[in-house]
């Protein structure tokens, strides 16, 4: 999720997170998969062995098992999925975004990405 970032509010959109998620196959090639994505936002606890603090926000799951729905979020030039997640409030601290990928065969993959607030 290296391209993932906080986005500021403007006249058109609320503050949010632009999240990019890539899934790799056994040959380390980024691929499309029929999966469901779940996003959760946590406070970042500074100088802690467990930096993930209180959960701030969740979003409804993104079920991408339908090919047409999957294509809506897939950015072929990046070989990744792009999600625009609206925030309930303006970002005022650093966060950790956790994404869980749920496969149809009940496997789960989880990744976390730190998000730094911009001045």
Model feature map: region roles:
Residues 31-35, 91-93, 109:
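Short loop/turn segments at connectors of secondary-structure elements within structured domains
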Residues 106-119:
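Short beta-strand elements
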Residues 20-22, 40-42, 84, 100-102, ...:
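Residue-level recognition of well-ordered beta-strand positions that form the cores
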Residues 35-55, 99-101:
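Extended low-complexity, serine/threonine- and proline-enriched intrinsically disordered segments
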Residues 18, 34-38, 94-96:
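Exposed beta-strand and adjacent loop surfaces of beta-rich binding modules
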Residues 26-30, 46-48:
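Short beta-strands and strand-coil junctions in structured, solvent-facing domains, enriched
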Residues 1-18, 24, 32:
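Beta-strand-rich domain onsets/edges
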Residues 54-96, 102-106:
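Short, solvent-exposed, Trp/other aromatic-anchored flexible loops in extracytoplasmic proteins
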């Amino acid at each position: 999720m290296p391209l993932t970032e906080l986005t500021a509010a403007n006249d058109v959109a609320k503050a949010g997170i632009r999240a990019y998620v890539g899934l790799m196959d056994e040959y380390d090639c980024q691929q499309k998969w029929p999966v469901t994505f779940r996003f959760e936002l946590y406070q970042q606890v500074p100088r802690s062995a467990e930096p993930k603090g209180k959960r701030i926000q969740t979003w409804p799951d993104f079920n991408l098992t339908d090919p047409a729905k999957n294509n809506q979020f897939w950015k072929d030039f990046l070989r990744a999925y792009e999600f625009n997640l609206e925030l309930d409030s303006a970002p005022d601290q650093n966060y950790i975004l956790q994404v869980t990928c749920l496969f149809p065969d009940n496997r789960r993959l989880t990744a976390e990405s730190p998000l730094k607030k911009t001045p």
